[in-house]
Regions:
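A residue-level marker of the well-folded mature domains of exported/periplasmic proteins
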Residues: 1-191
């Protein structure tokens, strides 16, 4: 049984003992009792990813492609995995600025956590505010909130403005297609 995410930590904690013959994998989480006790039993594997590494590469790639201007970051919930994406992204931008001749800023007011991974409308609203303030590209580590940001980028592009998104977790290029005939997407890359 593969459990995607920290919200299933307590369920796996209970299930791994109750169903000793079953095998469990939990992604981005460690089985725990909801308190201070955690246990990865012999029938369970806990897997974490190095989000900061893909965030870094996305930051460098986006900075090289755009060259100069303001970037933004929209996170879903403020949890360690999403924070690692943010940190890596910021470090990638800084690296590109210091070593590769780019001039990208990631201002504090353009780093926002929506609070959920499901509020599509909230993601669109946050992205609209950022694009309207001059942000050129937004990294979205936010689940469905990121789909809202992608939708807003398409709206901005339809209005003749520059708007890019850096997707997360999988290749989101197709989510950002706004010109099917020419296969053009608002998704610059994905981490």
């Amino acid at each position: 049984i593969v459990a995607p995410g920290f919200k299933l930590d307590t369920a796996i904690y209970k299930a791994q003992e109750k169903y000793e013959d079953a095998k469990f994998v939990i992604l981005d989480g460690t089985p725990n009792d909801g308190g201070e006790n955690s246990l990865v039993a012999d029938n369970t594997v806990s897997i974490y990813f190095a989000e900061e590494q893909s965030g870094f590469i996305a930051g460098v790639a986006a900075a090289l492609e755009i060259g100069e201007g303001d970037f933004g970051f929209i996170g879903g919930m403020k949890i360690p995995a999403v924070q690692r994406f943010e940190i890596g992204f910021a470090e990638g931008i800084a690296y590109a600025n210091e070593n590769l001749g780019t001039s990208i800023s990631l201002k504090e007011e353009n780093v926002v956590y929506e609070g959920t991974f499901s509020n599509v409308a909230g993601g669109q609203q946050l992205a609209a505010q950022m694009y309207d303030s001059g942000v050129k590209a937004i990294f979205v580590a936010a689940g469905s909130v990121g789909i809202g940001a992608i939708n807003e980028a398409k709206t901005q592009v339809a209005a003749g403005k520059e708007a890019w998104v850096i997707g997360v977790d999988s290749d989101q290029y197709e989510d950002g297609i706004y010109d099917v005939e020419n296969n053009k997407s608002v998704v610059l890359t994905s981490a």
